[in-house]
Amino acid sequence: MAFDDLRSFLQALDDHGQLLKISEEVNAEPDLAAAANATGRIGDGAPALWFDNIRGFIDARVAMNTIGSWQNHAISLDLPPNTPVKKQIDEFIRRWDNFPIAPERRANPAWAQNTVDGDEINLFDILPLFRLNDGDGGFYLDKACVVSRDPLDPDNFGKQNVGIYRMEVKGKRKLGLQPVPMHDIALHLHKAEERGEDLPIAITLGNDPIITLMGATPLKYDQSEYEMAGALRESPYPIATAPLTGFDVPWGSEVILEGVIESRKREIEGPFGEFTGHYSGGRNMTVVRIDKVSYRSKPIFESLYLGMPWTEIDYLMGPATCVPLYQQLKAEFPEVQAVNAMYTHGLLAIISTKKRYGGFARAVGLRAMTTPHGLGYVKMVIMVDEDVDPFNLPQVMWALSSKVNPAGDLVQLPNMSVLELDPGSSPAGITDKLIIDATTPVAPDNRGHYSQPVVDLPETKAWAEKLTAMLAARK
């Protein structure tokens, strides 16, 4: 069953024992973020968290860590909670091929129950805001989806973007938003500012898990997140029309904020503890003016803790980064077998491939760095043979330790682009990139002595299946 809203997803998590309801009174700071942080430190299978007794807030409901374990991620895809990670990614890939599935426009969204306009807006009254890390410069919306359109082609449904961007709440109806240059919203903003125009946006909070996953997925510029959400949930994704902008927004959201990114206006935003596990510091960022708020009665506020991995954002971004990189590489290089870009939104990628000829694996690694996502993220690539599973780190370490000769297997590319949030970049946004070729050399690259590999015995696969069945029967 596909989830049309956050509430049905929370119910499914609860039904599977993956929602922990905390009824005791807690402090907004530091308890909410600290509890979410702790879910990444207590082992596999961490639950989502629900708080409804928060000191200082009246009738507030906060959900955290909803996708913050492989069990929760599986449930979001309507898979059994115990589905292995690799099978979840394989299913993601299978459903990807359903694209596009046209969305379903619905009337009477629950978020239309209450509205506030103009100077009457006070986000501090509507949202139970709290800091996520003690060095953050303010309150942040970090799991909301932002909808924008191409100002030069506003009726092109595919060019309408749905993405997750951090936003600092700076006033009653004022936000600071960080449009990463490699992301579609930055291109929309650039086009608007060239014309001297504000960029209208709609911000959706408290969303179903599939559109949240899509907001973190690097699609091509003209691929619709709503059509891909339909493919991923295997049914048309429900949308509704936002009343002020006329944009397409999720039908099941808890809160809709509408307004504009003000043209050519920048103010200091940050610091903020980022997915890189480091604070990003303060920078001049865009300013958002909110002109209309629509929200459900008793809305659920959802936030996401992020810091040193693993936290919820790693579960959210991991498969959502692997799959598009795999699909884009596979389309050009059918030899590619698998892509593991689970680490820090793909700043590191491990790619397995067959090889046509010597040097082929390095060409694949270079192409990974020049995909739409790779331009801003893929900083290091480890290339491995087709018989090495990039999701099996012991196998990857074996390939690195036995097949890499630093004299010829390291390719360093100077002065390449990367997102400014990468703490290793210097200056911010510029870095050297590295390809590590841990594949077996093939002609005409005849280095090394790899003619006598030890392979699994022919009967090993059958015995593995037999032992697995015996263990399952014993349990």
Task: Name each model feature, range by range.
Residues 1-272, 277-287, 291-475:
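Extended, highly charged
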